[in-house]
Curated annotation (Swiss-Prot):
<dbReference type="InterPro" id="IPR044957">
    <property type="entry name" value="Ribosomal_bL32_bact"/>
</dbReference>
<dbReference type="InterPro" id="IPR011332">
    <property type="entry name" value="Ribosomal_zn-bd"/>
</dbReference>
<comment type="similarity">
    <text>Belongs to the bacterial ribosomal protein bL32 family.</text>
</comment>
<dbReference type="GO" id="GO:0006412">
    <property type="term" value="P:translation"/>
</dbReference>
<keyword id="KW-0687">Ribonucleoprotein</keyword>
<protein>
    <recommendedName>
        <fullName>Large ribosomal subunit protein bL32</fullName>
    </recommendedName>
</protein>
<dbReference type="GO" id="GO:0015934">
    <property type="term" value="C:large ribosomal subunit"/>
</dbReference>
<dbReference type="Pfam" id="PF01783">
    <property type="entry name" value="Ribosomal_L32p"/>
</dbReference>
<keyword id="KW-0689">Ribosomal protein</keyword>
<dbReference type="GO" id="GO:0003735">
    <property type="term" value="F:structural constituent of ribosome"/>
</dbReference>
<dbReference type="InterPro" id="IPR002677">
    <property type="entry name" value="Ribosomal_bL32"/>
</dbReference>
Amino acid sequence: MAHPKRKMSKSKRDSRRAQTFKLSLPGIVECPQCHEMKLAHRVCKDCGYYDGKEIVSKEN
């Protein structure tokens, strides 16, 4: 079986591992109706529109 020739430092080991555990950012886009930031492919929490149609009626 293969054995490491040199001891790997903790910082070298951890920096290599950090690449696999990266978190991806959620897709945040601007709402075309009210221009607020919202999650992509979801109803806007401010105006209630999705794909140009009013899904949730927002009453003031």
